[in-house]
Curated annotation (Swiss-Prot):
Protein name: Cytokine receptor common subunit gamma
SUPFAM superfamilies named among the record's database cross-references: Fibronectin type III
Sequence motif Box 1 motif, location on chain: 299-307
Source organism, top-level taxon: Eukaryota
Originating organism: Bos taurus
Amino acid sequence: MLKPPLPLRSLLFLQLPLLGVGLNPKFLTPSGNEDIGGKPGTGGDFFLTSTPAGTLDVSTLPLPKVQCFVFNVEYMNCTWNSSSEPQPNNLTLHYGYRNFNGDDKLQECGHYLFSEGITSGCWFGKKEIRLYETFVVQLQDPREHRKQPKQMLKLQDLVIPWAPENLTLRNLSEFQLELSWSNRYLDHCLEHLVQYRSDRDRSWTEQSVDHRHSFSLPSVDAQKLYTFRVRSRYNPLCGSAQHWSDWSYPIHWGSNTSKENIENPENPSLFALEAVLIPLGSMGLIVSLICVYCWLERTMPRIPTLKNLEDLVTEYQGNFSAWSGVSKGLAESLQPDYSERLCHVSEIPPKGGEGPGGSPCSQHSPYWAPPCYTLKPEP
């Protein structure tokens, strides 16, 4: 059988999707006996071999780009594989600095960073950082013998400083505050952004500060609680960095604050101590009051009301102790434990010659008066 001409074969190949052969999840791979030139007798037909979607060969993926950041000019991290795509094997990073002749002498990274057992970055110490020289990096796949095109980076544009520290507030006048802070890098190479708001504001107010490490707020209200925070960036005098540092710890001033709170804006240990002691003290006071109330209920008799006086006669038959609620032991302790003897005294008319000072117990008549007795408690 003669083969159809080459244009006709191409037309048939383009019509395969119309015949129900799906080419989207398939790749055309040569079988090893194909004839690109169309010579007869060499088996120039292609076989369709399918590869399931989602199981792409990582060797066909492009190498990821390298992203570098210099942290406070103390160390540098260059990372890759920031996307969710699978990484082709363990990649190696080669770096160097471009000289005046344009000759890039690259060397391999000495301190790799790993993620799930696969290289994901390279760490550089302070001595390896040349801030104002062109930094050259190249990512390579040693197994597939592939290389990424060289990347040229300006490290002065990739500096991220540390967050400002030691925020301090002081009063310049009755209604004016000054906020100051410090950085762990040269102040003339940093610009700052100050944010502040009161407890009655919903949004932050921003103020840019260049080359200085202080900020003045001319008008404040002592009845409000103010919050301040600062962040820094490498300024255009030393570089063109676009990344800000992290925000500093906030500092507060205003109502419900004191001088100690301004100097030490946050004291977690004191806050935790107050949060524990105040509830415990309140609960202890409540329990003590309940105990005192119960003790008084048991020891103090109830005071009867006037409307219950009828019960003293009708229900208790005049028994005051039972009606008043006095305990039996208390009633017995109130009764006397002695008896009185009567002393019979009789008056004898005085005789003549007797003065008024005669004793009433003197015997001036033939009748004897009963003896007099004094009150003595019974033994």
